[in-house]
Swiss-Prot record:
Belongs to the SfsA family. PANTHER family: SUGAR FERMENTATION STIMULATION PROTEIN A. HAMAP family: SfsA. The gene is sfsA. This is Sugar fermentation stimulation protein homolog.
């Protein structure tokens, strides 16, 4: 199902990652600095010469945002902001049964020592939701994380505490890759997160994974829920 469309969208050639947030790309024979919002290592994508896709941005030290990379004839979305916008469309269109009838009442609610992504109001009460970008591929699996994440550990701990306090809590993994049908944690990336997800499941945290990708035309396509293996 089409969720939204990105325009304008420019193909580019990825040259190198300058730092955590900036990459060099070639667009129409010009070398440009592009914003990278995903703080994962993304080693399977950040390969010199790989075809990426950018959109212009206003202001700042970068003129473009690196949204994704060509993958199996489509686009894997690495941009976490775009993933977030797509997730909000899924909520708005009531495409995730567990969140039917819900609406966002607060973004980045403070919980303990962290800020989670969303607080939603639903017919059966409120729910705290944290989203994570799962763009590491292993066969038909989308995986998270691709490197140690203290922040990710902290977020899962906060969700566990919420669930144990009787509140509804959910973590949603955004498998923004074409041709994946399942999600699992990448234990080599961060063994502690894999352990915490098992603890979260036992504590009552709802764990979901969603499949989406971008077409070369810029259309964001939602493919439904992915199977979850914790």
């Amino acid at each position: 199902m089409k969720l939204m469309e990105v325009s304008p969208l420019f193909p580019c050639i990825f040259l190198r990652r300058v730092n955590r947030f900036v990459g060099l790309v070639r667009i129409k024979e010009r070398i440009e600095r592009a914003l990278i919002t995903n703080t994962g290592r993304l080693n399977e994508f950040m390969i010199p010469g790989r075809i990426g896709y950018c959109t212009p941005k206003a202001g700042g030290k970068t003129r473009y945002i690196l949204l994704g990379f060509e993958d199996h004839g489509k686009i894997a979305i690495i941009d976490t902001r775009l993933q977030g916008k797509a997730f909000e469309k899924i909520i708005e269109k009531e495409l995730l049964p567990e969140l039917e009838g819900c609406r966002i009442i607060k973004r980045e609610p403070r919980v303990g020592e962290s800020r989670l992504d969303y607080l939603l109001e639903c017919s059966k009460g409120e729910i705290f939701v944290e989203t994570k970008s799962a763009v590491l591929r292993e066969g038909e699996y989308a995986m998270y994380p691709d490197c140690p994440s203290v922040r990710g550990q902290r977020h899962i701990k906060e969700l566990i505490k919420l669930a144990r306090d009787g509140k509804r809590a959910m973590i949603v993994f955004i498998g923004a890759l074409p041709n994946v049908s399942k999600f699992k944690p990448y234990k080599k990336g961060d063994p502690k997160i894999a352990e915490l997800l098992k603890e979260a499941l036992e504590a009552g945290v709802e764990i979901r994974a969603l499949g989406l990708h971008m077409e070369l035309s810029g259309e964001i396509i939602y493919r439904g829920e992915l199977g979850v293996e914790i």
